[in-house]
Amino acid sequence: MENAQNDMAHFHLPGLFEFHELYRAFLPLFREHREYFYSWCDIGSIYGAPADCVWGGGRLGFGDNDPREVLTLMQEYGISARLTFSNSLLREEHLSDKTCNRLCALFNETGGNGVIVHSDLLLEYLKGHYPNLYFVSSTTKVLTDSRQFLDEVNREDFRYVVPDFRLNKDFEKLNALTNAQKDKVEFLCNECCWFDCTDRKKCYENVSRKNLGESCEDHHCTAPGGNEGYRFSKAMTNPGFISAQDIRNIYLHMGFSNFKIEGRGLGSALILEFLLFFLTKPEYQIHVREAIYLDSMLDLF
């Protein structure tokens, strides 16, 4: 067991394309008013995919912002841009998709950008065609077995591996990892999915089929409260939830430094709440709200 304490948490945020306008407002604030935000955290990457990407997975992408504008914003603030191409059902004929290849070629130009992948077929293709990209093993693999998770961490193909959220509190096994292994682990902090769900893979496969344009019924969640959709208050009670205080007081001390926030399929108001909860000091949250949207004339009803 190695325990080199980390001093900085790197957050990996949702909505590269989906919430481009929100980040255009938030990132200048994050740079110019660092006193608003925790000194022990930064933004490691922002991930996502535009609408109608065959290689997409996890969630149905949306957002029609120009990819060059999206990438330029990330470069301006020194943030890695990640394409979420985690479709688990890709076949050989899908590898020639022009839209996805153009995006990879663009992100490959500057270096420092990555792709979140599930399919080994796609991984090998990307390694051969876009050598400047790094790769993240997607949480859509639903790695709940600690042995499988360790095998994935040990794969040289991946810079980061996102385990299933149900491994988040398996501290005995997590603490047994080497420092090099800990550096590759990226915890999913705010999952709302039922902790005992057995249909998680089926849910992700349904999204993969939709991105491929296949005709299929929607996946109907049968978990308790599944009809309520995502609620942050509910996610906070999930046994796998990792709070900002957990990160600062537990995970950094254990030697972990990478933390993923989900939410590509949600609304921008909820994404802002995540940014407030995880990155912003409580006494400055009102300042961030006022800078982003809140003024004296705003009506809710």
Summary of predicted features, one role per range:
Residues 1-152, 158-301:
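Active-site pocket-lining/capping segments in soluble small-molecule metabolic enzymes
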